[in-house]
Amino acid sequence: MADTVPTELIEFARHMAASHGLEPALVCAVIEQESSWNTWAVRYEPGFLARYVAPLYTAGKFSATEAYTRSMSWGLMQVMGQSARETGFAEPSLVELCDPPIGLEYGCRILARHIARAKGDVSAALLAWNGGATLNYAEIVLGRKRNYSSQPVK
């Protein structure tokens, strides 16, 4: 865990996790892996665009700008824009996902959905979260989870 992360941010993430029935240590580990606690982390995923978003754009469902922003991961948990839209995110700009309360709400909502679909198998849920791009992703995140497991939720 980075020593420079504000305690308030860690506590807020732990609170949001608990409010979604998630292990706070797991959400903190995902955040550390995905963004290193950078609230403004943004990454374009060209493979995601081609596979998931381009067919919707081609069908005229939304603009090119929306297509590209849906193909980006945003904020602390690196929530994919398309996943946020599918989960009910209706704000005009996906950059709002960089605001910790909003990004953590949608990130926790999506992660909880993956865990439910995987019938509680956290490793499988983490692979779904990551899109299977990194085969040892679950192992990495679960290793990071140990750094946060001994900290009680305040």
Show where each model-derived region lies.
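Catalytic glycan-binding domains that act on GlcNAc-containing polysaccharides
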Residues: 2-154
